[in-house]
């Protein structure tokens, strides 16, 4: 069984990813369209894909579409610094296809099996987001399968409404089949400065300052994120791409990246290859591998290196979901209720970050948490007023409440609490997640929709585009072949 698991996972190291070419792409699109048109018109459809990075349920009543021919890189143009990519291509493959050219996507989400199409329709952030925004902001053009069964090409000049409203639509408007994206030149190494903080106020001020100036202590910063262990212990990691060769750390073996950040005071320095920097969080799924014992030194020595990756930990999570292993073997014998999963990425402004962190660490024992600043990419304000339906929104990307020139701090926490954490008389049912939603709303924030959400329709509309999701859906999916945005992200359709 272990041999099969290893065989079914690709190496954690780089592999050669040759372009699939346009002929194979057209064949993949034809296969997708045949599967779409084979589904009765009164039945809903979804992608029949092997991977998912969503932490919410979904209905099994939809017919799966065949996307097996749409998971590659079509071509890379090193002169124009662009790539033509199929929607189901993972970032792991995309990075391995572009790095040999000295190029990489502007923003690479943290986990290897996130797909380019998924990151664009479902958002994604990483340490370059304070400079380069979100993954969809470096998209030049998309082909999208809509609910009518048509492949619609959209860009800043063509079908602009769909181009602006597709990000954060989570498949409610269709699926990206092809994406043409910009790439950035990148150097082979990354120097890290890991700065220790002892209070949330100075942490938040520094996040805001570096996000605006792109420098720290007069040195340019290319990547910025952070980890908070407690109110007295937090770190910001300032990354700088460099050509300078030298020794590098390897966190795919015995050492654990987030633990390496911890030091008493001042600045710790580290160096990684650019590929290891891109995937520094995937090896231990940030820190979530500890739930499976993978950070225990004895276990780590025998844990196959090839299985130190988020996609394998996901398989373990799915086993637990299917058979309720933790509940049946640990909690139920002790008379304890089921645990409440608390997996969220919320966003607040820097001035509200200290209050949220103070509250969160008092309200739960969950630690550590991840910090990642976001600013929309420069020039994106030109999209405002573009299109017909989308022109009604002051946001460049109307289904997500970010504005140009404003810094937001993504706060990620991925753990759980006891089922009776909030109310012993009413365990479970998302109680603590609802409390978090209320606190974030109180602070004028919002959250990503990849996990459970409990907003009322009215609250949801205030945050995620008002009636625009329904208005664009009436054009691209008049027969409702895909679930609506609220239906999909809150009602788990």
Predicted features along the sequence, with ranges:
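Activity-critical C-terminal alpha-helical subdomain
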Residues: 323-331, 420-421, 428-493
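Short glycine/threonine-rich loop-to-helix capping motif typified by GTGT followed
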Residues: 60, 235-248, 310-321, 333-334, ...
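A short glycine-rich, hydrophobically flanked beta-strand micro-motif that places a catalytic Asp/Glu
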Residues: 46-47, 222-229, 341, 346, ...
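Extended C-terminal subregions enriched in glycine
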Residues: 348-354, 358-363, 367, 409-410, ...
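Intrinsically disordered, low-structural-confidence terminal and linker regions
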Residues: 1-24
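A glycine-rich phosphate-binding loop feature that marks nucleotide/adenosyl-phosphate handling sites
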Residues: 49-56, 227-233, 318-322, 373-388, ...
């Amino acid at each position: 069984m272990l041999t099969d698991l290893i065989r079914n996972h690709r190496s954690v190291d780089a592999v050669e990813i040759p372009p699939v070419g346009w002929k194979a792409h057209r064949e993949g699109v034809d296969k997708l369209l045949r599967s779409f048109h084979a589904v009765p018109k009164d039945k809903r459809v979804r992608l029949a894909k092997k991977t998912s990075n969503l932490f919410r349920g979904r209905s099994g009543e939809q017919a799966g579409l065949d996307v097996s021919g749409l998971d590659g890189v079509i071509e890379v143009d090193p002169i124009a610094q662009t790539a033509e990519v199929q929607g189901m291509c993972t970032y792991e493959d995309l990075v391995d296809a572009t790095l040999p050219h000295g190029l990489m996507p502007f923003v690479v989400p943290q986990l290897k099996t996130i797909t380019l199409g998924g990151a664009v329709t479902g958002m994604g952030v990483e340490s370059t987001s304070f400079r380069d925004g979100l993954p969809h902001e470096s998209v030049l053009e998309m082909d999208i399968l809509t609910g009518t069964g048509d492949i619609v090409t959209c860009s800043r000049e063509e079908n602009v409404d769909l181009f602006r409203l597709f990000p954060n639509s989570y498949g409610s408007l269709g699926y990206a089949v092809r994406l043409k994206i910009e790439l950035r030149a990148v150097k082979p190494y990354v120097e890290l400065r890991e700065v220790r903080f002892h209070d949330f106020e100075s942490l938040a001020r520094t996040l805001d300052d570096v996000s605006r100036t792109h420098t720290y202590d007069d040195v340019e910063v290319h990547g910025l994120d952070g980890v908070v262990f407690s109110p007295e212990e937090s770190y910001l990691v300032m990354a700088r791409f460099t050509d300078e060769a030298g020794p590098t750390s390897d966190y795919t073996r015995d050492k654990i990246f987030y633990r390496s950040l911890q030091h008493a005071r001042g600045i710790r320095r580290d160096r990684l290859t650019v590929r290891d920097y891109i995937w520094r969080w995937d090896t231990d799924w940030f820190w979530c591998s500890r739930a499976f014992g993978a950070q225990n030194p004895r276990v780590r020595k025998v844990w196959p290196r090839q299985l130190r990756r988020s996609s394998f930990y996901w398989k373990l999570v799915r086993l637990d979901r299917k058979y309720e292993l933790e509940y049946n073997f640990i909690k139920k014998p002790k008379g304890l209720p089921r645990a409440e999963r608390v997996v969220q990425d919320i966003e607040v402004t820097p001035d509200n970050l200290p209050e949220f962190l103070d509250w969160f660490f008092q309200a739960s024992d969950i630690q550590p948490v991840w910090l990642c600043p976001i600013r929309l990419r420069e020039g994106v304000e030109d999209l405002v007023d573009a299109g017909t339906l989308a022109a009604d929104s002051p946001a460049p990307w109307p289904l997500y409440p970010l504005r140009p020139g404003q810094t937001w701090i993504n706060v990620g926490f991925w753990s759980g609490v006891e089922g009776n954490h909030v109310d012993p008389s009413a365990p479970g049912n998302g109680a603590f997640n609802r409390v978090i939603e209320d606190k974030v709303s109180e602070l004028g924030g919002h959250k990503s929709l990849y996990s459970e959400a409990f907003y009322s329709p009215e609250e949801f509309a205030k945050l995620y585009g008002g009636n625009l999701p329904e208005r664009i859906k009436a054009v691209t999916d008049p027969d409702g072949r895909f679930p609506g945005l609220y239906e999909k992200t809150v009602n788990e359709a």
